[in-house]
Amino acid sequence: KLNMYNNDPSVKAKIFFYYGIETGSPETMTDLERLINTAISKKNSNKISVTKSQQIGLTEEEKERSLIVNEILDSNRLNYHFQPIVSAKDGEIYAYEALMRVDINPYIDPPTVIRYAALSERLPDVEYETFINVIDVVEKRSDIFDGTKKVFINSIPGQRIPDEYLNDLKTRIKRLPGTVVIELTEQSELTDEELDRLSKLYSDMGVDTALDDYGTGYSNITNLLRYMPRYVKIDRMLLSEIQNSPQKQHFVKDIISFSHDNNIITLAEGVETSEELKTVIMLGVDLIQGFYTARPSAEIIDSIDAVIRKEILEERMKTT
């Protein structure tokens, strides 16, 4: 096309320019190299995004949404709210889960970001920016994350952070020993080889893992044994109105008993009512997370509502 245009200027030619920008104040050659690698990665991602959107036949509206999501990732505009995870023993905050929010108007929800990032083959960027942004907050809030509180970070199934970012991530996580917990889902369907790779990687980083959404889909004890996480998060589906379902109570009790026998900490996820709270405490769960105890917030709180904490303590007393 370019040769044709040189010979005949009337020939129409479409030229694409792909670029990547990363700003910073490098103090060492390593810092400079990281900035360059990030800019190159963004350039390559922009090229992939344009090509991908043409190949899969997106509508004009979808193409526009895809460009917006890529701009969000290029400028790292992913923010996070933190939802407390509380101890079923005393109502104290044990940890926080970091939940994605997007800094853009009009607002785009996280599932939309994930969808278009996947179409543009940029899920590794979401994964890396998530870890880095959350770790930034943790390091800045040393008054909260003083070695006694943990942060749960969701990992996107099947995504591998590029090698040029991985060493930086390892270094930063190792500065927070015993603080980071990485959430995995059964739906990731990891192969034994990939699971072994992740186990070695997380062991090297010094982080624990949590198996998320346990009790959904094809959940079974075999998967729990394959992953052997430090935490298992019992899905909301099993906990909704559990006080009215002997079947759910029996199943959840079995999960808790099996987990405790294998040194796995249990977490009831999505607790929304007082009745659900009382039931999971009666069944012996270790940790509780949900709107009833505390909602996600941009501001990291250091304690839950005193009335809710008192309720937890009173229910706990009944089981001892």
Q: Whereabouts are the PLM-identified features?
A:
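Short helix/loop segment flanking the catalytic signature motif in cyclic-nucleotide metabolism enzymes
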Residues: 1
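A short glycine-enriched loop-to-beta-strand structural element that forms part of the catalytic core
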Residues: 4-40, 149-154
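Surface-exposed amphipathic alpha-helices with a cationic face
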Residues: 139, 173-174, 196-206, 253-260, ...
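Charged helix-capping and loop-helix junction motifs
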Residues: 64, 165-169, 196-197, 246-253
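EAL-family c-di-GMP phosphodiesterase catalytic domain
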Residues: 24-28, 57, 88-92, 102-106, ...
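Active-site core of bacterial EAL-family cyclic-dinucleotide phosphodiesterase domains
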Residues: 53-118, 294-298, 319-320
